[in-house]
């Protein structure tokens, strides 16, 4: 049993969570919050048609020059289609921008160059008139804005593609943040999703590249994630759940905003306002005078505890969602995405950590999990038997296990076998020899077949590994900032 998530060092604030604390937290963890599953509304032909006209014009504008160039060069290169797709997403906004953000945050899945290109996609949106915000809140809460809040700032403190956030004060004097879904956002997202999937399928057919296939494979999980985000009761329940859970283990530097259920509903979420700066704002944090490495280490410990022991975790821990507070604590905000590990991903993560702690028996389990999910690809690309696979996985993963935390890449550790398989069967994009052209055409045919026959849908294991590895990459960055010597 992994009781101490991060081994203690002379200056470490990491601590062994006691058996009593774990027992109490286990009871709460079993009460995983019910999700209000929201199926996107059915869209009309007219809605799809209007949006398709806009999308077609944007695609023609962005991909026209690219296709002309590819016809001259007899191939569509990554340097051509990736920037064109990113600009297309930026022009179309809303759902497309959110998908672009997903690509930009996952170099382990899409490759460093592709992720770098999409990193400029910012999830933002236009202002919502205050009268409209007021109407939305009053419709959701069934009372006037003045009855709900003593003061409500009409100027938003945050504007994303699906919601806006305002600051307010309750009649009890509490400072709160109020998240409000944009008007008609569900229908706009539903129409976009109906058109995004065919667009990604066309990109796969045109390029045959693994990065394009990976985008299409992540679409189903993206659709599911948006369905959860469009009902703020899901986020409220997740916050209450983790607030209780982390309150039972002694990690005092980690805080979750308190939810005000009487001021929350499907389209409105009222929560404690957290004053702070993003965890990567080193200059401001240094001025707070807190021992930042100790604080960040407890956040990492909290994340690993929830993911390793209970298989659930915050699914979007970018720096803006980890607010370093002036009092030396970190507030973890924006619980719209919560990761839930399927049984195999949960076991894989635990066994990898146990392998890192010296359990040699873990490698056979790790190899067996990868064989279950990637057996055919491993056999075709690497031609390894069971013993060879175990040795290969150890060779890929073991070097990172003895490095200081700030130099460890847990995400690379999770994704190493998949990357190696892809590399072993990959094609040099810069090679224009006749043989390589033939191989590229063959890969394109395989990609088209995947789209037509299977829909290129990722498994629960793929999606869970993807979401977990994304968060680990963020924590690696914070580790390099604050704990490179731990």
Describe each PLM feature range.
Residues 1-164, 187-217, 223, 425, ...:
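N-terminal accessory/targeting segments that precede structured cores
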Residues 18, 34-49, 73-75, 79-80, ...:
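Helix-rich C-lobe and terminal helical cap/extension of kinase-like folds
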Residues 91, 95, 159-162, 262-273, ...:
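Core structural elements
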Residues 100, 165, 178, 235, ...:
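Residue-level signature of catalytic and energy-coupling elements of molecular machines
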Residues 119-126, 138, 186-191, 197, ...:
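ATP-dependent phospho-/nucleotidyl transfer catalytic cores
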Residues 163-171:
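Conserved ATP phosphate-binding architecture of protein kinases
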Residues 167, 175-182:
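Glycine-rich ATP phosphate-binding loop
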Residues 168, 310, 315-320:
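Residue immediately N-terminal to the catalytic "proton-acceptor" Asp
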């Amino acid at each position: 049993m992994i009781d101490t998530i991060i081994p203690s060092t002379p200056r470490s604030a990491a601590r062994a969570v006691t058996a009593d604390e774990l027992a109490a937290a286990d009871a709460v963890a079993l009460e995983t919050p019910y999700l209000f599953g929201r199926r996107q509304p059915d869209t009309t032909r007219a809605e799809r048609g209007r949006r398709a006209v806009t999308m077609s014009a944007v695609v023609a504008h962005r991909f026209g020059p690219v296709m002309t160039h590819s016809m001259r060069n007899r191939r569509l290169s990554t340097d051509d289609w990736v920037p064109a797709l990113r600009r297309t997403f930026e022009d179309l906004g809303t759902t497309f921008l959110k998908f672009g953000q997903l690509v930009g945050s996952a170099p382990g899945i899409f490759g460093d160059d592709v992720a770098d290109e999409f990193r400029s996609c910012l999830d933002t949106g236009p202002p919502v008139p205050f009268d409209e915000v007021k109407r939305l809140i009053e419709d959701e809460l069934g009372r006037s804005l003045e009855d709900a809040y003593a003061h409500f700032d009409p100027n938003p403190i945050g504007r994303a593609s699906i919601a806006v956030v305002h600051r307010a004060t309750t009649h009890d004097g509490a400072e709160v943040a109020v998240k409000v879904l944009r008007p008609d956002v569900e229908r706009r997202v539903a129409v976009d999703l109906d058109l995004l999937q065919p667009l990604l399928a066309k990109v796969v057919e045109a390029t045959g590249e693994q990065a394009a296939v990976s985008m299409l494979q992540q679409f189903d999980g993206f659709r599911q994630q948006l369905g959860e985000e469009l009902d703020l009761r899901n986020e409220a329940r997740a916050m209450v759940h983790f607030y209780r859970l982390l309150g039972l283990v002694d990690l005092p530097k980690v805080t979750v905003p308190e939810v005000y259920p009487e001021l929350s509903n499907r389209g409105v979420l009222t929560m404690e306002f957290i004053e702070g700066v993003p965890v990567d704002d080193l200059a401001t944090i240094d001025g707070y005078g807190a021992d930042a490495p100790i604080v960040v280490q407890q956040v990492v410990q909290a994340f690993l505890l929830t993911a390793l022991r209970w298989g659930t975790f915050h699914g979007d821990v970018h720096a803006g969602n980890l607010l370093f507070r002036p009092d030396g604590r970190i507030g973890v905000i924006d619980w719209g995405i919560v990761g839930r590990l399927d049984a195999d991903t949960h076991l894989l993560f635990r066994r990898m950590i146990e392998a890192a702690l010296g359990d040699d028996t873990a490698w056979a389990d790790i190899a067996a999990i990868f064989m279950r999910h990637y057996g055919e690809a491993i056999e075709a690309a690497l031609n390894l038997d069971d013993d060879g696979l175990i040795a290969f996985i150890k060779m890929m993963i073991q070097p990172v296990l003895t490095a200081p935390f700030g130099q460890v890449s847990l995400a690379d550790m999770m994704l190493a076998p998949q990357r190696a398989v892809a590399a072993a069967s990959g094609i040099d994009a810069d090679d224009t020899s006749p043989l390589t052209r033939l191989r590229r055409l063959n890969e394109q045919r395989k990609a088209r077949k995947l789209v037509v026959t299977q829909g290129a849908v990722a498994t629960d294991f793929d999606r869970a590994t993807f979401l977990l590895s994304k968060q680990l990459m963020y924590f690696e960055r914070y580790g390099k900032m604050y704990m490179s010597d731990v």
